Design a protein with these regions (language model features):
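Short, low-complexity Ser/Thr-rich regulatory SLiMs
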Residues: 187-191, 247-251, 327
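Active-site "cap" helix and flanking loop/linker of ATP-utilizing ligase/carboxylase catalytic domains
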Residues: 224-245, 250-251, 260-308, 312
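Peripheral (often C-terminal) accessory segments that flank ATP-dependent C-N-forming ligase machineries
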Residues: 284-369
Length: 369
């Protein structure tokens, strides 16, 4: 069986590396052959919206999946070829537009932020008056890792917010949630409808970018809330593959922030830290194979390597640290790799992950100590 992956970033690369031992072949489509996926598999080089190339991908593959959710759904509809597309395009469309995403959460009874659609300076002012301050003005599409956002703390920020993002209208305004922590859940649903959940991840962001994930985050009440929300989304979309939901924890309850219809950065710890990684389970699901166990092997942490890589030797000399280099060129704010560790207790994990974080990302370490 050949699995096609639209996008050849690090997520696609890790999917292929997880799928080769299962006996699958992989074919990527990406605008640049010099990508992480290009290190591990052949690439059809061209625009992700090129319907001719997408059609060739579907003709050469048995199933097609994604490592990025912002591929225009219109380009993927009605393609020739034998390939099934998973996850379903309805889920992709909902995740691409923050307004559709919020409405989906509301439809399914999943608590989320208060929000309003904004398409002009006047509707922004109305939204601020209705929802209140502080709040966040966001682009409705192509927002990730903190991009396309402006925080308003007083009414004096209205002009600056519109100046910054007005040209990208339509937009979304939502209240700024006072939260205690951020968590995510990674769920997977097979072609046969079987569902499995990984334990909750406890996440630390700085400047809108994930810096540190620890798992499992043990909280029975929040786990039930997260699994209930994920199951509703999986069933609503008749979903196949891995789905991630990010939440704020506010006053003991979960507030859904966003969903990602793909494998997720907060699940990278599963490569070493779970019986079956999120990447292997995604491949299993879209290929119609039985799902693997999502049980953790211990207490794990994942630290992102952002902007520049630390000295590799300094990491590799420490027992139990796992180094993942995506082979990308350095650039401020860019995810270049990650480091993981697995310990026998949560305390050991926390102590060691803070120590490693202090060496790799001192600004984040100072912010959370």
């Amino acid at each position: 069986m050949t699995v096609g992956i639209v996008g050849a970033g690090q997520l696609g690369r890790m999917m292929a590396l997880a799928g080769y031992p299962l006996g699958f072949d992989f074919l990527f489509l990406d605008k640049d052959a010099r990508t992480p996926g290009g290190q591990v598999g052949p690439i059809l080089e061209g625009a992700l919206t090129d319907r001719e190339l997408l059609g060739r991908l579907c003709e050469r593959c048995d199933v097609v999946t994604f490592d990025w959710e912002n591929i225009p759904v219109e380009a993927l509809q009605g393609l020739p070829g034998k390939a099934r597309i998973a996850p379903p395009l309805r889920a992709l469309a909902a995740a691409q537009d923050r307004l559709s995403e919020k409405r989906t959460f509301e439809l399914l009874g999943i608590a989320t932020t208060r929000y309003a659609a904004v398409d002009s300076r006047t509707t922004l002012e109305t939204a601020v008056q209705t929802i209140g301050l502080p709040g966040v003005l966001k682009t409705r599409t192509l927002g990730y890792d903190g991009k396309g956002q402006f925080v308003l703390r007083t009414s004096a920020d209205l002009d600056a917010a519109w100046e910054a993002l007005g040209k990208a209208a339509p937009l979304l305004y939502e209240n700024l949630v006072p939260f205690d922590r951020e968590v995510s859940i990674i769920a997977v649903r097979g072609l046969d409808g079987a569902v499995a959940f990984y334990p909750l991840n406890l996440n630390v962001h700085r400047a809108g970018i994930l810096r540190l994930t620890r798992a499992p985050f043990v909280n029975a009440t929040l786990t039930r809330q997260a699994q209930r929300a994920a199951r509703r989304l999986l069933e609503h979309f008749n979903y196949v593959g891995v789905l991630t939901i990010e939440f704020f924890v506010s006053r003991g309850k979960l507030i859904a922030n966003e969903m990602a219809p793909r494998v997720h950065n907060s699940g990278h710890w599963t490569i070493e830290g779970a019986v079956t990684s999120q990447f292997e389970n995604h491949v299993r699901a879209v290929a119609g194979m039985p799902l693997g166990s999502t049980q953790p092997r211990g207490h794990s942490a994942m630290i992102n390597l952002i902007g520049e890589l630390p000295a590799r030797e300094a990491i590799l000399t420490q027992p139990g640290l796992h180094w993942h280099d995506y082979g990308k060129s350095a650039r401020p704010g860019r995810k270049l790799g990650h480091v993981t560790l697995v310990e026998t207790t949560a305390r050991q994990r926390d102590l060691r992950s803070y120590k490693v974080l202090g060496r790799i990302d001192r600004a984040t370490w100072l912010a959370i100590r």
